[in-house]
Amino acid sequence: VTDYARHIIMQGPTYGLQTDLTNKDLCGFVSNPMEHGEASKLALYGVADYSWNIANYNPLDNWERGLVDLTPEAHEAYRTFAMHSCDTETGYRRIESWETKSFRIDNFTDAEFNALQSEFVRVKNAPAQMEANCKNALLMKELRPWLTEFGKLGERGLKTMSLIKEYKAGNDQAFWEGYVNNRMSKEDVAAYEKHKSGTMV
């Protein structure tokens, strides 16, 4: 969940586990929550499922079920946050934002643009949806600093999408002014670096 990357609260699937182990290979399996006990439950859900039925363990299926079981009233918003909060920046975990396709500013289709814009809307709205619907107050207390920065990420992403339109339309002045206004201040950067998500969007 945090472990060796305290600025990222990893909420992605528990993957990379061998599924051909038997009782001849091991006699037990130990795992523990990190300092954010409630936020650790999604990973522990994966570990529990794996240790119960190793041969049939499916990390993505397990993760999807875990989101629903842990936050049934807010699982879509939690899913949006969790999917974009997986990468450690160390190269150990690399699967993040796997449903999001990015593109170069000079090479994209309308469908790709609309899909990415819609994802940034979901990112922007996820924190408020979690606040309104998630009944686990302790989980919200743990996630709130990251959710705050996640919402800001969505806002910056949507502004960036608007900049792409200005660029394509040849509105150089509007593009430049929008770019300058969308830049993060030193304080913004410091807050984001402390509670980071969306590192691979």
Predicted regions and their residues:
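Substrate-binding groove of N-acetylhexosamine-processing glycoside hydrolases
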Residues: V1-V201
